[in-house]
């Protein structure tokens, strides 16, 4: 399976629109002659269009240079990741490898043909002075058919996709097209093909003070789904983002639990804890492997006695392979789509009507709990103090997530408090990393000793971690005081 990142924009023009001369746009010196192709794509989705509604598009396309199965998933910065697979038989349905990648978006439900898009394409390449392809511009004469309700549409579209060019080039081409009468189209061809059916789904959060809370919770659910495909393939950033989203969602359901059915909310939180645990095994192994690899390579050569880096690399690679296999098994298990389905029922169903004071009381309670837990932790030394600081960190995460809910309505004051909570949380996280790293080093040192290897370097790294941890508390105290200044909390007391 091939994976590519697409950065493109789409434009539509009235009848009679003609592609303007694009030379001079962002370093474009030459525009190639057009090459023509006839493309025929069938888009697959669930009966309630879950894939499209969650930013996914699954199609089997014939014609053109990249015929086959394509799964497109939204990515950071407006880009889209496309997973490509050979076309195979038209009757066989999506290959298992792609089916695994849509399991979150589809909620494990079957996908069937939803729309057909036939497209006559004329494609040109935009070249710089060295003959390098900066972008490809495709003029498409499109005919779509909704394979469920039979609705058909036709339109003319221009698609600009970056190759070796940058966003400035896209902006320059967009300006040239706009001057020629084109309008940027914010939705894909597949969205336009089933627009009437999509209009029947209202995915907006409810109005009123509960709206931002529900909207925030839905964003976390959507982040879980949006990162599923990349996390399934072991992408470090996706695993991290998916884990953070599950944690944010779990904290939100707890902080604002009066908005939803309490029993169902607790059950969903338990399942999110399970998912977060599976993601955490992978992420923690990735982070610890990188952390210790850097620590070993930062030492002078004369202080590295024995094959320390190689041994750690081998063991972490084995641990990561095991954790990744366990994560894939979890995402392949029916428990995972069942969790997402329960989340849909909870978050898309009716929420209790509350006023803003109710929301702010819950935020203040989360903040007070975090403050109290940190003050208690700072009064305790030794291993018990380390455990208490870790618990305080978790409380501040919950407080930060609660405040994030109000950023849209409280504006800059809430954003400032979020930023200061994040700084405090990061310091507490650095301390916890040191605690965990020391335990990992101790465990690996014992194993090295049992295998007859020199353990000096493990002990040295352990001592350095302990020394660094000794400087954490003064920094934590300063960061704590910054979070408690009246200027950053006044808005919560209104």
Where are these regions (language model features)?
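Function-determining surface determinants
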Residues: 1-494
